[in-house]
Design a protein with these regions (language model features):
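Conserved G/P- and acidic residue-centered "switch" motifs that form tight phosphate/ATP-binding loops
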Residues: 24
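ATP/NTP-dependent adenylation/nucleotidyl-transfer catalytic domains that generate, transfer
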Residues: 2-19, 32-42, 49-50, 61-82, ...
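Short, surface-exposed alpha-helical segments at coil->helix boundaries
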Residues: 27, 31, 52-59
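Catalytic-core regions of hydrolytic enzymes
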Residues: 108
Length: 250
């Protein structure tokens, strides 16, 4: 992965990378692999009414990276006021759709911030999504954390992310923390939102073509969850649809 990133930067004549660091395992691994390229790396913390534990893990990880890799620098951009101002600007609504829209807006504010520093330094944004999120259940925000230039770990299953994180001696607090997208005002984690663990979703990805009679009741339940997410979020994984105009119409 490190060599792939270096080769991409070389071919693109780009001199550095920008990564958003959240305190989660995916961004911790991605930022570590980017740091290992030896190229300039800006790690950006972007708290939005964030839990103190997430902020603490993020800071510890960035401090660890900077102590180990001289090519790493960091920025702390507190987006609390920006987000709160946005919330006040849109109509009040008590629906779930309103809360979900605001959650996704947090992710999109972070994308805007990452690309500000990317353009400022003529760097590129490295995404932090793994294979289960990006190509299994589409568990990310379109034009939010899905808005990136390269995806170094998007071919790694979540279990492989954990294995590599341990190999690279990433902070155990990060490894042991329950995965969360950090987009809500409560303590819900990814499993709460999905209805299954990443280990279960991985199994479902491999069970997708098996006969249901070969599966346990829980496996059937998780497979149904997987298929539902995969179907409803498939638009995130495909190119933007283009209306093709027949030449004889022009």
């Amino acid at each position: 992965i490190v060599n792939w990133i270096k080769e991409y930067l070389k071919n693109s004549q780009i001199n550095g990378l920008v990564v958003g660091v959240s305190g989660g395992i995916d961004s911790a691994l991605t930022s570590t692999l980017c740091a290992e390229t030896g190229k300039k790396l800006i790690c950006i913390e972007m708290p939005i009414n964030q839990g103190k534990d997430q902020v603490s893990r993020s800071k510890k990880h960035i401090d660890w990276l900077k102590s180990k890799y001289p090519n790493v620098s960091s920025k702390l951009i507190d987006l609390d006021n920006t987000f709160d101002s946005f919330v006040k600007s849109v109509p009040e609504n008590n629906s779930y759709e309103h809360e979900l829209s605001l959650a996704n807006s947090r992710s999109r504010l972070r994308m805007v911030t990452l690309y500000y520093f990317s353009a400022l330094n003529k760097y590129i944004v490295a995404g932090t999504g793994n294979k289960v999120e990006d190509f299994g259940i589409g568990f990310y925000t379109k034009y939010g954390d899905g808005g990136v230039d390269i995806s170094p770990i998007a071919d790694l299953l979540k279990s492989e992310v954990y294995s590599l994180a341990k190999f690279h001696n990433i902070n155990e607090e990060i490894i042991n923390a329950k995965p969360t997208d950090g987009l809500w005002n409560d303590n819900r984690n990814d499993e709460d939102q999905i209805g299954a663990s990443y280990d279960e979703i991985e199994i479902a990805m491999f069970n997708d073509h098996k006969s249901e009679r070969d599966l346990s009741e829980r496996d059937k339940e998780v497979l149904k969850i997987y298929k539902s997410f995969n179907s409803s979020n498939r638009h995130k994984m495909l190119p933007i649809p283009v209306c093709k105009i027949p030449k004889d119409y022009i």
